[in-house]
Amino acid sequence: MSKISTTLAISLMIITGVIGLTIGYITNPQYKINMYDKTSMDFGRADRTLDLRYINAMIAHHRGAMLLATAASTQTQRPEMKDLSAMILKNEPGAIAELYQWKKDWYGDTKEVKDPIVPNLGSYDEKFDLRFLNALIAHHEAGLVMTKDITTKSSRTEILNNADAVDTFLNTTLKLFKDWRLEWYKI
């Protein structure tokens, strides 16, 4: 009987631990913040599908911005964050449509790109905008890694022009986000 009780006790402890970790992961946005692993942004060698890999990654990147903006648009109280979310939700679909068109025209590929997993920003509180800014900063830094990689490997003019435009935009807005974070949160 004591052997069964010990086994049962250990099993219950393991189950409780797993449940606790799961609840912590779901409810604490910081567990998900490391989703932008910059070590995984390499497009590999310059072969015939290099540009396709960039296109798919950039579609997912733009969708990630939209998912973050959608979450923020209903939570934030700051006018700057509301305007930023509205701008993202207005502009990103056009960029995505252009990338899908290139994908279809150049590769005959009409497969939809899977949405990325983005950080859970949590419910509104005094640190909500900080979480949103941190997520956008990480998102932009990942995008910059992508544009740097593709500009050293691709020879297609449209891809290089896209990467240059994205790089310029990301650098400009990254500075703005860091300025807001410093002004609002002294970080």
Language model feature labels by segment:
Residues 1-16:
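N-terminal Sec-pathway targeting helices
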Residues 15-16, 20-187:
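All-alpha RGS (Regulator of G-protein Signaling) helical domain and cognate RGS-like helical scaffolds
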